[in-house]
């Protein structure tokens, strides 16, 4: 299977990339940083999700896309950073979907992840996909992002 991963330099993306690269998969990484440290055989395509759709070659022949790109959340949340977090989820996803929509052979699967913050801090409560969103900044970002038409 050929899998494209955005956000492969992030906390989840790094681990996912390494796990998939260790299997029998072809991995294409879309990253803002050309110097990203990649496992052998992983193809790198430079893409800034805020500036426009990814390069056509980065998605050519891809069976699945895992979209994890976005402004890092592990930093101090100033008003400016909060706006970057909001914008990076919506704009990056829109640019990716725009590119996918023009392809003659589209990937079978698009998985997007924004933040576990959707559920908020609920202690020992067991959460499922049917659980309501939590409260707070990240929950609000996730809810707004998931409601954006793509």
Language-model-detected regions and their locations in the chain:
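Rossmann-fold NAD(P)-dependent oxidoreductase module
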Residues: 15, 19, 99, 148
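N-terminal Rossmann NAD(P)H-binding glycine-rich loop of SDR-like oxidoreductase domains
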Residues: 3-23
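Residues at the starts of beta-strands that form the adenosine-phosphate
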Residues: 2, 26, 108-109
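Active-site Tyr-X1-5-Lys
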Residues: 135-150
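Conserved glycine-rich Rossmann-like NAD(P)H-binding loop of the short-chain dehydrogenase/reductase
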Residues: 25-32
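SDR active-site strand-loop-helix element
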Residues: 6, 30, 65-69, 110-116
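NAD(P)H-binding glycine-rich loop region in Rossmannoid oxidoreductase-like domains
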Residues: 35-92
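Conserved Rossmann-fold NAD(P)-dependent oxidoreductase catalytic core, especially the SDR/UDP-sugar
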Residues: 84, 94-136
